[in-house]
Amino acid sequence: MTDQSPILRLENIVKAFPGVRALDGVSLDLRPGEVHALMGENGAGKSTLMKVLGGLHQPNEGKIYIGEKQVVMDRPQTAKQNGVVFIHQELSLADELSVAENIFLGELPRKSLGRVDWEKLYTDTDAILDRLNVGFNARTRVGDLSIANQQMVEIARALTVDPRAVIFDEPTASLTDSEKVVLFDVIADLQSRGVGVIYISHRMEEIFKITDRISVLRDGSYRGTLNTAETNEEDVTQLMIGRKLDLSRNKVQHEMGDVALEVRNLSCGKLFHDVSFTVRKGEVVGFYGLVGAGRTEIAETIFGLREPSAGKILLDGQEVTINSPQDAIARGISLVPEDRKGQGLVLGMNCRDNMTLPQIGELTSGPFTSDKAEVAIFDKYHDALDIRTPGWRQTVGNLSGGNQQKIVIGKWLSMHPKVLIVDEPTRGIDVGSKSEIHNLIRDLAAQGYAVIVVSSEMPEVLHVSDRIVAMFSGRVMREFTTEEVTENNLVQAISGLSEDRVA
Amino acid sequence: MSNINRTDLIKQGAIWAFIAVELAFFSIAGKFLSVTDATFMDPENMLLLLKQSAPIGIIALGMTIVMINGNIDLSVGAIFAMSAVILLDSMGWAWMQSLGVWSIPISWGLALLTGVVLGAINGLIVWKTGVDAFIVTLGSMLGYRGLVFMYNGEQPTSHLNWTLVDFAEARFLGLHTATWFLLVVALILWLVMTRTVHGRNAYAIGNNREAAVNAGIRVGPHFLWNFMLIGFLSALSAVVFYSESGSVNPNDGMLYELWAITAVVLGGTKLTGGYGSIISTLGGVIAIQLLRKGLGHIGSDTETVNLVIGLILIAVLFLDRQLNRKGKEELRV
Amino acid sequence: MAEISKAGLSGFLARQGIIVAFAVFMIVFAIANPRFIDIDNISGVIRSSAILGVMALGVTFVVIGGNLDLSVGSMMSFSTIVVLDLHDKIGPALAIPAMFGMTLCLGAFIGFLVGYLKLNSLIVTLGMLSAIHGLTLTYSGGQNMDIADKRGTWFNVFGQGDIIGIPIPILMFALLAAGLGVVLSRTAFGRKVYAVGGNGTAAVFSGIPRARIVFLTYLMSSFCVAMAGLMQASRSLGSQNTVGQGLELEVLAAVILGGASLLGGSGTIFKTVIGVLILGFIQNGLLLMGLAFYAQYVVTWVIIILAVWLDIAAKRGRLLSPIA
């Protein structure tokens, strides 16, 4: 790195919300042409810091400098006018509008009488799209684009001004590997033009691949900046969580029982075809593949949320028909869903009520629900899973991601399932809770549960599974035992490169 | 519009196809069932139909914009009545009478101002408190109606001005004054929604409010403008209607919000905002009025119209959902 | 510590603000005019609120389940007209169950559309508002409905009778409120209604039959409407076709005033009862103060907005909306 004067400098930023000090004196500097990673667990203050920088929050203390000039970011435009642009994690596009209107959202070129200058709008848009080398045009409706292309629209939006600093917030969350390559090319291009990039991500491989420096936040305070070339994953993790993390792949092996779940030639429309596999009692089977490979859809079909177009599901050797989640639950199948907040929890309800929801109909004395029976279940899993909450009356929405996930897991363990399906068990969960949940999954298998883990994170799949099913584009490409699997052949299988397909 | 693809064409064509079916049905059925000898498709009859569409129509056009925004306005009927009361009452004031013909534009101005102010109150509350527009306007629907009753008790407010009546009954190129108002408002709003920054921002906000906020669109003032606009249009509707009738009951305009919303939904505007078209709403308005007149024409009880419109509204919703289904693969939630 | 108690206070106000407001309101009016808390006056207010109140109980279920019901007003007109008509045709003992049956069919139809067909409840019930109004007019031929022999029937007990001095409408309202309150807060069905309204997708993922629960909330709502229609018919023994017109919004106002969120998942029967009583006592209090009858509308408007505003302001921690 050449030591140039920073293009962007945050100095001692403090932001307090009622009851919380979200940012406690954070400083950061961004040099021209560098990719600067911003890391931290969820709730560490990354988003708040970026909102302050973007003019969506006003800091209580601290200063922001663009070059040598101090700037007060009082509204979103101010940031943009100063060449600081954001590419948000959650796509913020208007589906019904055209690509051009989205790119120039909030600053459509005007003619007299408040009319839109369509000609200028399309010319300007085409110029930007040319630079990105994309396969759609300015007039396409954004709702008709793929997720990756929508992300490109977001990036194009950043290029409407000649940016000095671009902030990417978890940009690869929903991208395929080939789409990531395109994204990294764009970042490299920005870098070569002397633009500074702030890159927020949880994914270590990416961070080490493309960034120059890494700054870490923890609990709203600044923990230091490392040169990427001079550090490693463990050091960064330690900085993030304040302790060492055991990421070893060695797991305790235990006895396995009979086949609990068998799936034969299961298909569901265009989502997945001809999928067969078995899960034994005491076994963890990992499903690994890219987003859209059909893993979640298989889980949902087994749980009765989708109607299979062909194939059989067998439980303990008996063929079963599952038409609804009620059927699945009655037969001893549980699903911890992918989207914790959207599918797993009723956020406005308290912890206990969430946990007892699937069996509330049975927890009755006479016609009424039994407080005692409900609290007993909560207490049991509260202790067993080490859920940190002030009490069962706490609203679930107020818990951290990790504790929320434990509530969902507790909810399904309390049903004593034969087969437990866990979809993306640690998505959006901080590193500390992650390993707790991994250990928990291993413990459950040891207790004799048949477990399916669906995950997009390779280390996770490698860490928890006894067997790994690799999927690509709705098909099972290959099954691996722990001995067979390497990162390399796993990646090949899920990219559709594997030759030896196991049906 | 810059991008019209096929599904858009189907969506925007549906209401006109529906109108064509209505016309055909009532013309044919009318031959057998009609209580009079008049033909349904009689041009004079159709022109009258357009005129009768105007009061709800002008409001429905404004409602389209508010609904594209992702809001709703339930207070339009009350604003309509309040503006009408101001219009007719102000013409009776002593100093106004001394102005002669000039009292007309002034009372119009006062009535329109009333609408704008009441709309602005709604808009300001939505903007500043962050309370959902449904609740805000549900409240003001009661509140504004209360104001109407407090103004003159349960008595009708009347003032007949023959110059006005002549104006309202005049026809230009065959169309009634009210029809002209409806068409001009539709044209202007169509231009606003398709050609201006304000209109495009309305779609953006309804489509993805957070994105609009992030992009620096000032959502609050934008809402305020649109509530003022629909207040203005409710008042304009009252001005057009009561210039001719000359007498307003404090209960007038009740359920107008429901009729207007029905017309907008029939026209295909999304309830969640972000999608809709002024022209299709005009189609929705005409379709409803056609149904009213048509049912009368074939000798059915005028009251049946409520039943039929209610069921058609539900049927449209059902069809829309069936068209948007993804088939068997869909998640069962 | 000061911060905690302040947060505790605003949290308390957010949760129980409506009850505090109700108490303050009653005290102020009682001081302004002692007749306000006269037992006859209070009983009169509750009695005249009972019909609205009974309907609000049913709508509370629908709203907590995450939907709206704008059809209750015209449905109430329907049940009133039907029971009055049948009274003379088949006698009150058969007319009442027949009317309940017909009203429940309407509720089941709406429940089917919203629950099983998953259509938007605002539009469905808006359509049904209009459709049921048309149905009522067709049924009655547009005529007012009257019982021929108003003196020779026991039918008036539901609206005019009393037991040990307590008017029967009040008794019916109270019993129904108590019963439905228990159903909502103490049974598995009640819990499922909260879950479906709070997060319908999560409820389905927890094995709760969302469609059936939504269906049942509309059935309960129509049951309450039938009850209200019975009380209305029995009170007046004759009725116009439009007797319930506009009530849907007053009912909704009471439910919202009670603190139920239109997004679903929150609210209680007890708070709805408070909401109903507030509306009733405002009307009464303003009349006693000599204000015009219609001033209550304006005051109700202000109170609804304030109630909802303060509720969300407490949740977001600031008075004004953050939208620019």
State the predicted function of each range.
Chain B
Residues M1-A60, M96-I106, R332-V333:
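Membrane-interfacial amphipathic/re-entrant helices at transmembrane-helix boundaries
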Residues M1-F32, N214-P221, L291-V333:
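Cytosolic-side transmembrane-helix boundaries in multi-pass membrane proteins
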Residues N3, T129, A133-R195, H222-W225, ...:
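Transmembrane helix-bundle core of multi-pass membrane transporters
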Residues F26-G30, D42-W95, L124-V131, V264, ...:
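Single transmembrane alpha-helix segments in multi-pass membrane proteins
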Residues V35-L48, V148-Y151, R171-L173, M193-G199, ...:
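Inter-helical junctions in multi-pass inner-membrane proteins, predominant
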Residues M96-M141, G283-G284:
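Alpha-helical transmembrane segments within multi-pass membrane transporters and channels
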Residues S103-A111, V117-N122, G174-V248:
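Helix-loop-helix "hairpin" substructures at the membrane interface of multi-pass membrane proteins
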Residues S234, E244, V248-G310:
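Transmembrane alpha-helical segments in multi-pass inner-membrane proteins
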